[in-house]
Amino acid sequence: AYADDLILFANDHRAANRLLKVATEFFRERGLALNATKSAALSVGVVPGKKQLYTHTKNLFYVGGKAIPQLTPDDYFKYLGSRYNFSGQVRPSVELLKTQLARVQSAPLKPAQKLTMIRDHVVARFLSCLQSVRVTLKALKDADRLVRLSVRKVLHLNKSSPDAYIHAPIREGGLGIISLRAHIPAIMRSRLFKIATTADPLTATVLQIPAVEKFYQTLLRWTEGNGGSTTNIRKEWGRKLQESYSGNGLRQGNTSGVSGDWLRNPPNFWSGADYIDAVRLRGNLLPTRGIPSNPPHERKCRAGCNKTESLSHVLQGCPLTHWHPIRRHDRVAGRLRQIAEKKGWMVEEEMRLRLADGSLRKPDLVMAQGDTIVVCDVTIVWEGPNPLTMAYHQKVAYYSQQPVLDAIHDRFPGRSVVVLALVLGARGTWCDQNNAITDTLSLSRAQNSLINNCINGSIIVHREFMRTSFTRATGGRGRGDI
């Protein structure tokens, strides 16, 4: 075993050797050892009569008979993610970030794995490396720009996709990649503020040092407009996403993290193309004519239905894909049935309930177990200005009318009836009221499966729309015949 990140300071090489001997003995007694080849020595002196520094290149320090390499003026060593040379801390650079992002892009990984590498490893590493008094605002902006460029390449997002979709938290509907430009100044500002307000009077005087005070004022300028704390920064990115073309309605799932679980753990049956389309679906970025950058006269649906070809229109109301949203609905309802049957529920789909006035009701699922009857209707709506809870309460109210309950009691006499609904957003948003159905049926892990099937169904609807509209426009000819 080796002890990492240990630095010994001394006024001369003799004192340094004594410290090195003490450290070697200390670790030896605890079963540890210093590794000379992974260590570095930096010996700096002042040229007599001149204000110039020089470095010793002769080996002055040894561990176990092995010399510790001496650093030259061109060398540096790493400590806690930062680089140091004989003149102090090296100014942070984004070149290493650029190199690591390029490696991730070219790696033989799936898009979901690449996104995880960027979010949880590359960006997280530089969150520490760039926390330096020598960091510049330009370096932070360049770092964010490189990260966004890499994410857009990995996920095939167009240049017009909003930055907020990349930086907003997953719970708020984004991809959860933190903004280094926003977070690093806020983190350093918070740390200096804690030092200034500490109970230790000696530590609190640090901010009275002119250089530290100047840097603190710089951080105050850099954090203007974003709340100054990481919590407020995340909320601000969520607000920007909600106000954008991509994020409208996605915040409805922010009380539960289940709506974005697939971003980190996509289902096994998804291909890389499925994952990319799911990300673009979530951000309202699948190709349509109704995007704001198109002139108004070019936004009409290519199916000829005289409506704006928005993604919500394609997925929910276009006659060209009439049957595919129905199949998506049936797929989600069928999946809920499969899960319920595994838990011992007797399930009947689209039970025909004839009411006293002769009208007919056909709830999607009627489930029976013991003395309990659960009536559940499934609906998939667009995440827009209207909350998903509105659709939920409408469904429950529709099947909670007394004539409907009477028809159910006639079919199942002596049993208690519970009317519930399953409401999903077309982009994979989970309505919190759905927890009533999963709790009643004891389906603790059903949410992810239902959401994934809904997303996959929406992807199929869009693909069929693009295929059918292209076939119509070309008269059935293939792309190579045009």
From Swiss-Prot:
<feature type="domain" description="Reverse transcriptase">
    <location>
        <begin position="1"/>
        <end position="84"/>
    </location>
</feature>
<keyword id="KW-0540">Nuclease</keyword>
<keyword id="KW-0695">RNA-directed DNA polymerase</keyword>
<keyword id="KW-0548">Nucleotidyltransferase</keyword>
<keyword id="KW-0808">Transferase</keyword>
<dbReference type="GO" id="GO:0004519">
    <property type="term" value="F:endonuclease activity"/>
</dbReference>
<keyword id="KW-0255">Endonuclease</keyword>
<dbReference type="InterPro" id="IPR000477">
    <property type="entry name" value="RT_dom"/>
</dbReference>
<feature type="region of interest" description="Nucleic acid-binding endonuclease">
    <location>
        <begin position="208"/>
        <end position="482"/>
    </location>
</feature>
<keyword id="KW-0814">Transposable element</keyword>
<protein>
    <recommendedName>
        <fullName>Retrovirus-related Pol polyprotein from type-1 retrotransposable element R2</fullName>
        <ecNumber>2.7.7.49</ecNumber>
    </recommendedName>
</protein>
<keyword id="KW-0378">Hydrolase</keyword>
<dbReference type="GO" id="GO:0003964">
    <property type="term" value="F:RNA-directed DNA polymerase activity"/>
</dbReference>
